[in-house]
Amino acid sequence: LASANLEAVSDSGYLGNPYRAARVFGAAVPENVPRTRSSRALNLRAIGDLGSPNAPRSAIRGSYRYFWDNWDVKSHTVEGGYSRYVGESFLLDGFVRHYRQSKASFYSDDAQVQNTYVTRNRQLGTYSGNTLGGKVTYSWRKVPGQYEINFNGGLELLRYRYSDYTDLRSGGAYGLDASVLQLYVTANY
């Protein structure tokens, strides 16, 4: 099964943050971003069933997303994953994702010229990220056509690296490493 989606978004109004400051010649100045933003995204996805009548149900998936906007931000996201049932009650799922983004035309860590628009919002800067994740779903109670109750647990390991954003505490490039643990119950009826 495969899909291709094209997304178009147009924003207008106050798109900045009144509490965020940019740096110009080392001095803090209020952030100023355009009041309009138009973006597009192309998303390609495919999923395939790997199971056979005598083997556990399993599937592999892959996706690619390209994003661009009129602020000159461009990004690429590539993701791959694998899912497999273990017995009748457990579903195991794993994935890996890579993200890469270029900076907005008015982004600067420390601007050396005063322009109309300026921001130091690191999410509009150049950065890349990698995620490795896994999830386990246990089907506790299930009556087809009536209800299903599942226990879920997931773990994601994230790493983001910003190439043109200085951590003011250390003077080096900013980075983020995180582990996200999720435990939750779902009920469908």
Residue ranges and their predicted role:
Residues 143, 186-188:
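Beta-stranded membrane pore/translocator domains
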